[in-house]
Amino acid sequence: MNFLKLVIQKKKKKMIDETQKIHGSKIEIFATCVRVPVFVGHAESIFIETKKKIDLKKLIVKIKSFSGLSLVDKKIDGGYVTPDESAGEDEVFISRMRIKNDFNIGLWVVADNLRKGAALNSIQIGEALIKKFLK
């Protein structure tokens, strides 16, 4: 096995393990990892299957209510955010939301991995805990 295949397999396993750590081990994940030459950013094409019907309007309102998430919902060519465009931003950008049927949705998600990662997440979690429990 060559080095690149080994790295990609480890990244795929890490993606699955971290998602299951957050959402529980029962969540099924079909992951594909690809290394592409970008200066900054992580990008994910996410396909979600739900047990309940998806109300796209409610989902859009909910996403827009979260600080740190930015929805780019343009139904035109180029109406999505690229990793390069996320550079220098703290937000996680969601675009290309599309419903396959009432129970499946696809998303394109990008973020600047140098800004939005474990360090910033830790600060934001700490701020939220202080706001909730110490004020």
Residue ranges and their predicted role:
Residues K58, I63-V72:
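A common structural junction motif
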Residues K5, V36-G41, L71-D73, I94-I99, ...:
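Generic structural "secondary-structure junction" signal
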Residues I29-F30, V72-K75:
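Flexible, glycine/charged-enriched surface loops at secondary-structure junctions
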Residues E49-K51, K64, T82-K135:
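C-terminal helical cap and adjacent loop that interface with cofactors, partners, or active-site loops
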Residues K74-P83:
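Glycine-rich active-site loop/lid that clamps phosphate-bearing ligands
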Residues M1-K62:
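Active-site-lining helix/loop region of Rossmann-like oxidoreductase modules
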